[in-house]
Amino acid sequence: RATINSMFFTIPTIMTWTRIVAIPLIIGVYYLDSLKVETQNLIATVMFVLFAWTDWLDGFLARKLNQTSAFGAFLDPVADKFLVCAALLILVHMNRVHVLIALVIIGREIAISSLREWMAQIGAGNSVAVHMVGKLKTTVQMMAIPFLLYDGILFGSIDTRDWGAVLILIAAILTIWSMVYYMKKALPEIRARVK
């Protein structure tokens, strides 16, 4: 019988929890008035990259340590969504991401998360299981956000603002594509229950 610790506090789930804990820390950096904006950007970028890396690490550890669980499978994408959405809100506030792009991405996350929850309740969760396009969307988001947080020139020649703008646009396109994909997968189940 699973204990509370074995469900919620395995090494992989602790790594996942850190992504949620990261949110107020990253936001808090921008309230440290004693730091220059460039320093705030650098710290927030490094923190985001480190915490986003745990998305790969927790999955690797879960398989390596044989500590996969239903709770871990649930928490992992939730932590990703919280981290990405919080970062997008910061970037909108700082005029580094257009509000429409942020609304598309955040709106999709809410819509598909709700769809998945409903499909799971009716026993059809497998029809909207995570697909490669969804994983690609998350990867591009995780690449775009650090560039936009840094907001400067990297290694003397890489303008992270330009790269970030292109990547977040690609992420928005993938966001819409993945939403259409999941909706099409769910449609037969929805129609069957409307009849």
Residue ranges and their predicted role:
Residues T3-P12, W17-T18, A22-I23, N41-A52, ...:
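C-terminal membrane-associated helical module and adjoining short loops/tails
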Residues F9-I14, S69-D76:
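Short, amphipathic, aromatic/basic-enriched membrane-interface segments that mark the entry/exit
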Residues T18, A62, V78-C85, T139-M143:
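Loop-to-transmembrane-helix entry motif
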Residues R19, D55, D76, E109, ...:
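Divalent metal-coordination and catalytic microenvironments
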Residues A22-F71, A87-L103, T160-W177:
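Membrane-embedded alpha-helical segments that form the functional core of polytopic membrane enzymes
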Residues I27, R63-N66, V84, L88, ...:
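Short, function-defining helix-loop hinge/capping sites that tune catalysis or transport
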Residues V29-K36, L61, L65, H93-R96, ...:
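Juxtamembrane transmembrane-helix termini
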Residues F71-A124:
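Helix-adjacent hinge/juxtasegments
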